[in-house]
Swiss-Prot record:
This is Putative phage-related protein YobO. It holds the Pfam family Peptidase_G2. Residues 12-21 have a biased composition (Polar residues). Residues 1-23 are annotated as: Disordered. Keywords: Repeat. PbH1 repeats lie at residues 199-221, 237-259, 260-292, 294-315, 419-441, 448-470. It comes from the Bacteria. The gene is yobO. Gene3D superfamilies: Head decoration protein D, Single-stranded right-handed beta-helix, Pectin lyase-like, succinate dehydrogenase protein domain. Transmembrane segments: none annotated. InterPro entries: GH28_Enzymes, PbH1, Pectin_lyas_fold, Pectin_lyase_fold/virulence, Peptidase_G2.
Amino acid sequence: MVHFKNCPDPSLNANSQSHPEFSSELEHIKTRMQNFIKHSVTDQNIEVTDARVTAEGEVTSLLKERLDKEYYRLLSKITREVNVADFGAVPDGRDNTEAFRKAIGNGRVKVHVPAGEYLVQGIKLPSWTTIVGQGKGITVIKLHEDTPAHEWVITNDDYQNGNRNIFVQGMSLDWNPSRQCGVRNPGGQFSSCLTFAKVEYGWIKDVEAINAGLHGIDITSPTYDHLPDTDWTKDGSRYIWIDNCVTYGSGDDGITTHYSEYIFISNCHSGNPRGTEFAEGVSNSNGIEIDDGSRHVWLLNNFTSGNIRGVEVKAHELWPASQNVHIIGHISYRDVRAFDLRHIGHHQITDPESTTAYDVTLIDCSAVEPVFNSLYDAVTPRALVISAYKNVNVSGFTAIGDPDYDYKENPVVALQYRSQNITINGIKIRGFKKAGVDINLSGGSNKTDYIKISNFDIYKSAPKGISIGGGLYNVNILNGTMITDNGTVAIQSPNNQATILGVQSEGYSVAASIKGQTYQQVPINLKGGIQLATTSGFAVNQTSAVIAGTGDITARGERNAVISSSGGSSTEGSRALIASSNNAHIRGNQASRTILSSENIILEEPYTVAGGHQSIKWLLDSVRGNGTFAGAISSSLGGYGEYFESSTGQLIHTGTIVTLRGEKIVPANVGDYMLGVISETSAFISGASSFVWQGRYLTNEFGGFIYETVTDEESGELIRVPKQNPDYDTALEANYHSRAARDEWHVVGLVGQHYVRIDETVNQGDYLTAHNGIGTKATEGSWKVMKITSAYTSEKGYGIALTVIK
């Protein structure tokens, strides 16, 4: 027994040509199609243009206009207009096959079929034939009880040579699978309600296809065996328009195309297949399927529901994928996968790459509440899936989920399996609360690649917004809003290669997780050479930048930047920076060089920072820690000092005069060599070992560094660096403290002006000697008091004098 699943009411699809708004709608569709085709820019433009030229050489502006002209040619070729009832057709349960055959004859005829249900064993239409009923559900043509399982309800009569100019309108076609106690398609491309095979110029309008053994409507080639390296549409159908049709209960797909081209499918409904073409639980029965070898196909304002896939653009492993397919204004309601693009057998890295899966657009399409379906248990709900296809454009896509439906953490949109060059603009997603992620970009060896997502809105949907897979480095995410409740992460990527700009998020625990780093605001992440606020700059490398400059400034190398500069300033090599300079240049393939605030200089040495006017005037050497200056070094402080360690390991107070005990210092007494004074005002200080342990690098017998030549890991250049002491323990580096932070080390002022502790004997102009580290009056010497800055008091036990040491 055949079970009908929510068959649509035929009255919903009644002929609407009598309504004035219908004409307006057709004009709107025509304008959209015309603009779309005229302004399309694909490699197949020439072929599409040729398709708009009639057999008489007349150029039409639109392929549909050529179809219209061919329709009028069909009317002009008709020499008879008959009613099938005049040939004995009666809707009373008898076999009317012969009556239809006689009425149709050899073609060039318009056959009218009155209201009623007519049983036939298949109708074959020759060229130049129009068959017209009274409307869907009013005129019904149904297969007779004795009809073989392989028969169609209607097809063309010459599969070998092909047919042309056939028009079918205004009827329901019932394949009657319950005949003979239940029949199914015996295999092959038989058993459909209506098939055009090798037909040029065909029209199918206002037709209802019911319970087909295979497909409701099939636009095809006589055979399905054309390889990708052949002219695979040579024997297919072309210039076909399917309009305002309904299919349901199909054994496989509702409306499908194979090895055919220039097909229009508009204003149609296809849903609720029976799936009997497959084993139970694995029925890939789809609403509209643009299958093997189809190309130049337009789907306009159609509706699908209850299918495994609402619209599938695909091919099987051995056959060419459908190309140049345009889906406009389609609504998928409760199909499992609303829109699915794939080339089977070309998904894994071990599979051959598809050479034919190209050029699909989806414009203003909607996926509403995709759901699981027992027809195919293993297929999980998605709004959009793209696999293996390249050059795909999705614009104005809307995905609406049921917040209470369990999507079992599956993604809403999945780009996967070696798909590439995909643009998604203006996508809106909401309501998939129990999905796993709204947009999933698969990584790994079978990754998708070169993805652009822009002007998108995700609202109260999955816990994750956009997930980027590993090894995926070419993703642009621009201008989006992501708002949800109790979300986990808005954008997730295992690397920082995605370009992210202008994205806002709300309601996620983490706005972004990029290479393990989490953000509470979605960051701006830009890659590629950037030219910003410059009238004439060049960022040559993908990791270089020129910013706020003029005069053909150029950043050539990796991680190079030229900022606030002019006069043709340029960088080369790796990790180079020029800032606030004119006509400054970093040259060669060395690494880590910087020019600041300079005019007309050239820097070549690695690991240096330099500046100057007309020539380098100062240079800092990061390898050796040296600084070189052509001019003076100024300080508000006075004197020169060096670090010395106290012999006791204890702090010696500022202003104390010290002497040497071996290599360490103690407070000086009368007769001691006065080394210097503990100072806090030395302008120049040496011996600090500020950054690393003083013994980290090997030295020669005179204390100079021992050098070695090593290869820079990044640039490959040979550089000369101090040789590390084999006894150096890097594990202790974290606990190392500069001498400035340790009590036992002191800055000892050796020459210049310093503050010295003095006793009550000292006056301005006196010489000093030392007693227990405190200055006392001497008759001569090299220490002379310039002025008393703090008079001696017995309470403190000292005064303070500014003293010059020579």
